[in-house]
UniProtKB/Swiss-Prot annotation:
This is Small ribosomal subunit protein bS21. One of its GO terms (molecular function) is structural constituent of ribosome. Belongs to the bacterial ribosomal protein bS21 family. GO terms for biological process: translation. GO terms for cellular component: ribonucleoprotein complex; ribosome. Keywords: Ribonucleoprotein, Ribosomal protein. PANTHER family: MITOCHONDRIAL 28S RIBOSOMAL PROTEIN S21 (PTHR21109), SMALL RIBOSOMAL SUBUNIT PROTEIN BS21 (PTHR21109:SF22). InterPro entries: Ribosomal_bS21 (IPR001911), Ribosomal_bS21_CS (IPR018278), Ribosomal_bS21_sf (IPR038380). Pfam families: Ribosomal_S21 (PF01165). The keyword Amino-acid biosynthesis does not apply. The keyword Ribosomal protein applies. It comes from the Bacteria. The lineage of its organism: Bacteria, Pseudomonadati, Pseudomonadota, Gammaproteobacteria, Chromatiales.
Length: 71
């Protein structure tokens, strides 16, 4: 869990904004949403495989775009 210490003479609203930003960077809310309901191990494997395919397609598209810009 991210923590934020109040600085000297810092408004509470600013500290809340910093806390929200650190939570966003740490991925706390997305993790909570992902763990809200039980996910079967097969569903986990399927989701991870789909993410790997998406990453590889994105990498391939970037390579193709870079290759076409060279000419």
């Amino acid at each position: 869990m991210p923590s934020v210490r109040l600085k000297e003479n810092e408004p509470f609203d600013v500290a809340i904004r910093r806390f929200k930003r650190t939570c966003e960077k740490a991925g706390v809310l997305s993790e909570v949403r992902r763990r809200e309901f039980y996910e079967k191990p097969t569903a986990v494997r399927k989701r991870k495989a789909a993410a790997a395919v998406k990453r590889s397609m994105k990498k391939l598209a970037r390579e193709r775009a870079r290759r076409t810009r060279l000419y």
